[in-house]
């Protein structure tokens, strides 16, 4: 409710205002601004609303677990589920690999994080925590690119299945398109499955930028292969808890994947890898990708496809802007992240997808 003060200036009596927004709508001078909360602005799938008590609530039927609200909340009021204690317990019980081998599967976007140290020192830090081996999720991306290119050629149209938030969005908002989602596991799950099948006493921890991976790890199709998920922020917390200064450590080597597997971390990288997969396998297919950078771009592409007006035969869907390098669990969201991922890709020893996956055969 508006009142007039001693200076004849209108102000809003907060004790009576119910925040209906009507005054903002009728003010001809736009002197009253109706502001959304940061979490609401961040949520592009409209899963966050205000209840009658003006408290923010999350509609789990709309939430895709992308973590945008977690990242954008300036008060730290929204938290994703953490498996840090589970990981600490797994590290302790592994007894430095004597009880079982604990594998750290690191997402390729790690190349753009921990910019105060060298990547090789981060790998050494993981081993200092008690991990037996560090493996690139990008090798799983090479596996996916190889298989997904064949699947695309067979079916004629496909959407990617690497981003769990994107797949959840299709399931919730475009269920009629679910049959068009690639049947391949994500890179995380693909490489974890290989590890579990070849090393019976292995346990796997995925470390990456993505909060939605925590939900993916609970799916029946993925749960047997992934024991826990950590974000880069949580990994930094583990280093801090051990007073581990990784800048003092020697550099270890990470050399499992190809250039194409590594660039999965940024928008457009998946499509480039699928194109390379088609080329390397001599598959005659005219790839027309629709690269969706962010969930709003995904929505537009899926809407066009649902109306049969999309001029593309492959949708690369990434819920976070920039791709995985824009994930909510990242330590940094800088402009240099894409360049760092591309540099990391160029440094790969394996120059083709076939070179990378040959060690698996």
Label each PLM-derived region with a short phrase.
Residues 14, 40, 70, 123-124, ...:
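Short glycine-/small-residue-rich flexible loop motifs, especially phosphate/cofactor-binding loops
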Residues 19, 65, 187:
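Short, glycine/acidic-rich beta->alpha junctions
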